[in-house]
Amino acid sequence: MTRLSSAFSKPHAALVTFITAGDGDTAANLDALVAGGADVIELGMPFTDPMADGPAIQEANIRSLGAGTTTADIFAIAAAFRARHPDTPLVLMGYANPMTIRGGEWFASECNKAGVDGVICVDIPPEEDAELGPVLRAAGIDLIRLATPTTDKARLPAVLDGASGFLYYVSVAGITGLQQAAQTSIDEAVARLKSYTDLPVAVGFGVRTPEQAANIAQVADGVVVGSALVELVARHGSNAAGALQNYVASLKHAIVAARKA
C-alpha cells in the first residue's frame, strides 16, 4: 500500500492541506500541518503566472519568488519533510513550466529522490501530458488529475486515463479560494464521479470552515483546504505554525466526527 492509498483508507475522509513552498517558514509550517492532523500535504510550486489561483495563493507565489525560492529549494524542502515525516504523503502542485523546463525525466527523478508521492499539474490537459505522465508513472509517482463541474461524461474518460492516487474535484468553476459550491451540487458531483472511477475523490476550492469540511466529508473521500491556510501564513508570516496547527486540528476534528456520525 502506498502512502497515498493508506491516507485514503482510514475510516474518515482524508484532510488534504495546501501551502506554498518558500512562503514563510515552510518547514515549520509543514510540521504544523502534520501535527494538526493533515492526512495529505500538497506543496505548491511557486510560478510567475498562477492562472488557476485566487488572490491569496497568487500573493503567496509572489512572496515566495521574491524570497528567491527555486525548484531546487522545493525539492530540498520535500526531501527534508520526507526525512522528518516518513509516513505522510506529499504531493507537489503547480504548473507545467517549472515541472518541464529541465525535462520531464529530470523532474520525475527529482520527485523520486525527494520522496514525493504525487504530482498535480494544473495546466496540462490529459491529451498533452506525454512529457510528464509516462515518466512519473515509471517512477512510481501518482499523477493526480482534476475534474470540474464542466467535466462531462464525454470528457471524463480522458481525465481518468492514466490518473492515479486520487481524483481532485474542483467544486467551483474559476480560481481558488473565492467561493464555495452548494453542498447539493457537491453531493451530486461526487456520486457521479464515483460511478466512473474507483479512485478516491477529494473535493476542494472554497473550503474554509469546519462545518463545510464536515459536510463534504460525509460524501467525499477527501477534503482539500488551501487558500485559508495560505491566508494564515500571510497574516502571521514566519510565526504561522501555531495558527496553522490549531486551524487544521479544528478541521480534522470536524471531519472525523462527520464520518463517525
What are these regions (language model features)?
Residues M1-A7, T48-E59, G66-F81, M99-W106, ...:
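Active-site-adjacent beta->alpha loops and helix N-cap segments on the catalytic face
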Residues M1-F18, I77-A83, V256-A261:
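N-terminal amphipathic alpha-helix/helix-capping segment at the start of soluble metabolic enzymes
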Residues K10-V16, H85-Y95, L136-A147, K194-F205, ...:
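Short beta-strand/loop segments at the ligand-binding rim of alpha/beta enzyme cores
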Residues T17, L33, I41-G44, C111, ...:
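Conserved, mostly hydrophobic/aromatic
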Residues T20-G24, M93-I101, P125-P126, A147-T151, ...:
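Glycine-rich beta-to-alpha transition loops that act as phosphate-gripper elements at the mouths
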Residues G24-A35, T151-D161, V203, V207-V223:
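Catalytic cores of alpha/beta
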Residues D39-P50, G118-I120, I124-E128, L167-G177, ...:
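Glycine-rich phosphate-binding active-site loops on the catalytic face of alpha/beta enzymes
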Residues A191-L199, R208-A261:
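Alpha/beta catalytic cores of nucleotide-metabolism and tRNA/nucleoside-modifying enzymes
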